[in-house]
Amino acid sequence: MKFFAVLALCIVGAIASPLTADEASLVQSSWKAVSHNEVEILAAVFAAYPDIQNKFSQFAGKDLASIKDTGAFATHATRIVSFLSEVIALSGNDSNAAAVNSLVSKLGDDHKARGVSAAQFGEFRTALVAYLQANVSWGDNVAAAWNKALDNTFAIVVPRL
């Protein structure tokens, strides 16, 4: 998985302050509403932060409009969204905490090897949240659940970078 498995970033931690079942349900239901838009999610991230696009050798330096409809772009977007979907599906159940920790730790390790910074994870987070806000029913409760999930994820990922 590439830098964008970073999306996992987006996902649900299980460490310091695990998501409650209600918080996990909010994250899961809002994610379900957009998770079929893999290409649009990745395109939104790249449009907001071209430095992230440039971390991918197959997309670096290319016009987003020229790559967005390619098979390579769709394949990569699907990998990222699938990773996020896996982590999100595991959230809200204490018995899955070790699995979430393992997945998110590997994400951090893999992205350290690619030279991805904590700041770039922050950019990804910002772009993902903006995409969610524009495309799902977004209230204070959903925002709080996603912020907690992402904070938990960062608590695992950032020390590994």
Curated annotation (Swiss-Prot):
* Pfam family membership, one: Globin
Q: Which domain of life is it from?
A: Eukaryota
Keyword Signal present in the record's keywords: the answer is yes
Source organism phylogeny: Eukaryota, Metazoa, Ecdysozoa, Arthropoda, Hexapoda
The residues that the entry says bind heme b are 76, 111
Something else the entry says is: There are at least 12 different components in Midge globin. There are at least nine genes for VIIB variants.
Keyword flag DNA repair: no
Record's Gene3D superfamilies?
Globins
Which gene holds the coding sequence for this protein? Answer: CTT-7B6
> Where does the record place the Globin domain?
18-161
Q: Where is the signal peptide?
A: 1-16
Subunit text: Homodimer.
Entry similarity comment: Belongs to the globin family.
Q: Which UniProt keywords apply?
A: Heme, Iron, Metal-binding, Oxygen transport, Signal, Transport
Which GO MF term does the entry hold, naming one? oxygen carrier activity
Species of origin: Chironomus thummi thummi (Midge)
* PROSITE patterns with a match to the protein in the record: GLOBIN
Q: What is this protein called?
A: Globin CTT-VIIB-6
A cellular component term (GO) from this record? hemoglobin complex
Please give the InterPro entries that the UniProt record associates with this protein: Erythrocruorin, Globin, Globin-like_sf, Globin/Proto, Mb-like_M
